[in-house]
């Protein structure tokens, strides 16, 4: 990795606006470490016609400092296909970078840390899916985007936490195989008459939250609004005021403007949402995703300057995996028109 860049007057001047925006969530002592990378990365992006896609779980200095496109998995998949950049850097985990490559196969797609994995994606293999299809012949397979390219290639249609119910019901069938998140499967099952055949995958971040924890927080903050992610256990969802995708959670806070809110998800999202909602108090007994936290500014800089950690996927896998993603996006477009 490159040595620490220097915090010069030029760097300070050119990043002052960014710091003013995020100073409530980034300690002043840390800024001289972040700013030089932000400055250099933004310069390099222009020179190389590169774009940085960042998931909502990225830290504020990445999210507001260098990202060109921010959002949930669905947003990033759609934007990866639309970008005119020559290079895509995914400030997210490995399956997100794979999805970007699937949607833009002719672009160079890089990830700052090749080992930024995902407990959900690692919970199932393509062979597991093939076995399930043999066990349940003719039953459509709906796969959460938090999966590898090889798993997507065995899938009929993908979904995200934002559109799982719509995708399942769009198939017009009585039952589906829904992979790999068991909690998201249970959440979808509560909202549809379609029989859900689930897998046992779990997100290591959301699985740690408990209803007891939420109940104790309500005692401490009687007016607390609890907003959870569908990857949480069912009793956590039942104890919440609202459940939705990361983008849905962000929109809920923006619209409702609660006095006190607890986002039952990865820690950095609370920091990012607070920047845009300064009058709301964010309660933070949250959990860190060790995989997302592998994405750091120095790694983004090294990745961009050296064009390392390129995502390479066999063309036959890309072609097979692209179809279920396109079907998912089509469902979203159709529902937005109805």
Predicted feature descriptions by range:
Residues 2-264, 269-338:
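Active-site loop-to-helix "anion-binding N-cap" substructures in soluble metabolic enzymes
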